[in-house]
């Protein structure tokens, strides 16, 4: 009997309940709320669900995830050593059609203009007392690109990774709610009614050459983002070449789904109570909203300028698609345009700045790394 009591006491002392804190309880509640939003409300379920579950796992005491060899340490290593974000970019590249951007190259400027939100949030973060590396990692939320946000945070501010990732993916899911009021604020109804000419046909040769030339140029300009841009364009080359269908299919489906699970779960595993339950987390979430609004406004305002310069041939609404939430931001441009004129079709025109935003966010991240440096 004594031996049983000793064994039972040992089990209790070694259990997670003994080390369980109110912070762990709060974070588990946060995980459950995120699961509710993902599953019931449909907020980025493929991403927020594993992030939320990883958050719950991270706040179980005495698991040894960070110290004991195993699958969880492997997943955390995939984030720490920047393995997963480039692989996600390969899948994104395989699913992306750069045709609208090639057909109308000036929309690249709209993708660049939308990155103003990144730098607005960066300045805001510095004013709130974040150091320049932390501010850079927070600012990239404005690019509406989850993998790039995680990539930059892991290099510049690993302790803020969880908050930055949750803010980025949460606001990406809220693009249809955040963008329309900003778009309508900065445009008149007449501007929203502008119909754009049909895009020219892009040749197969152009689609094959584009990822090769883009990779070489951007990688030479900003070597720090070569892995992101290189994988993005390699995935695109798989699709556009016409002779690598199996690789394209794998990148779009099996690889993309597998890496998404690991990246999102690993992000959740970084959301420990001691690092997440701080005033900084609230500030990051607020700055993320400022970044999204700033990016949308920057794209629309540059679209207005472009419309003035080309005699009203460009609908300013497509500028809001310069954030890299593909294809959600382009769809929002289409919806807002059709609210002004049901016969207005802007989707393909908006896809130009939308895919340019993917490149633009990576370039913005590379610029920050070049200017500030990683960890």
From Swiss-Prot:
GO biological process: glutamate catabolic process via 2-hydroxyglutarate; sodium ion transport
Transmembrane segments: 16-39, 46-65, 74-96, 107-130, 137-153, 160-178, 208-232, 254-271, 284-302, 316-332, 345-369
Catalytic reaction list: (2E)-glutaconyl-CoA + Na(+)(in) + H(+) = (2E)-butenoyl-CoA + Na(+)(out) + CO2
Keyword Translocase recorded: yes
Molecular function GO labels: glutaconyl-CoA decarboxylase activity
Keyword Membrane: yes
Primary localization: membrane
Top-level taxon in the UniProt lineage: Bacteria
Identification of the protein by name: Glutaconyl-CoA decarboxylase subunit beta
Gene: gcdB
